[in-house]
Amino acid sequence: MNMKKSVFVLFSLCLALSCDASVWPAVWIGCHAEKSGADLRVAYFRKSAQLNTVPDAHLIRVSADNRYKLFVNGVLVSLGPARSDLSNWNYETVDIAPYLRQGKNTLAAVVWNYGEKRPMAQMGTNEIALLVCADGADPVFNTDWNWQVLTGESYSSLDDFVVPGYYAADRGERFDANNYPWGWQTEQEAPGFDWKQARNLDAAADKGTRDRGGRLLVPRSIPQMEMREVSAGDINLPLTVAPHTRTSVLIDRDSLTNAYLHLTTSG
């Protein structure tokens, strides 16, 4: 009798879990060709759509493999996902209504995948993937083959970065500004970049959906990190870096700051 009760309770829990979970109306999208799975890879995705009116709210759920930055009309609105594993893949829910406008609107995302030599804390696959899905809103921005994708050539791994012994962090990266599609978030990049139709990858599904595996989706359980501009201080000194040389700049902050620098260069 006890065995029957246990089996019935287990069956009931599994049935409830499967009923609550579902396959999403958007799909994971990716590139048509990527570099070796051992390398850092970057791709740019975007989709533009016309809106006759601006809604009071427009909730979307967004995730990527491994990481993403999401822009609406050139404004950064989300960064993620939170650390995940394939059985518990996080997504963020974002209200993009404050960034929309009447007329043409562009959603854009840069997605990067660390490849086989990713940091130990970064789980996932070796394939770039992006997911955007409306949460009760107009599905016009749901990811599918109607999105555009551009394979990035500006970023590469620091393969000559060697640490003796065990090393669990990222290798670091190189950035070549000559190959970067400046203005891509709002379709204002220079001509000549080879944008392609995005490739549909896998169906997107909640954790607990029957007969599904890989990137099982769960809502983010921790808040987004605070991100705001802070001044580096009033420093106005000339600095000349001769060609083919290196220099170092130390900025001493009075408080702990995880800094993402904005550099303005010319030439």
List each language-model region with its residue ranges.
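Positively charged n-region of N-terminal signal peptides that target proteins for export
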Residues: M1-S6
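An acidic-aromatic loop/edge-strand motif
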Residues: S22-K35, V110-V230, D234
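Short beta-strands within extracellular/lumenal beta-sheet-rich domains
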Residues: D39-L51, N90-D95, P243-D254
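Aromatic-lined ligand-binding clefts that engage carbohydrates, nucleic acids, or primary amines
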Residues: A49-N52, D56-F71, L107-A109, W195
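Solvent-exposed, conformationally flexible loop/turn segments
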Residues: Q102, G233, T240-R246
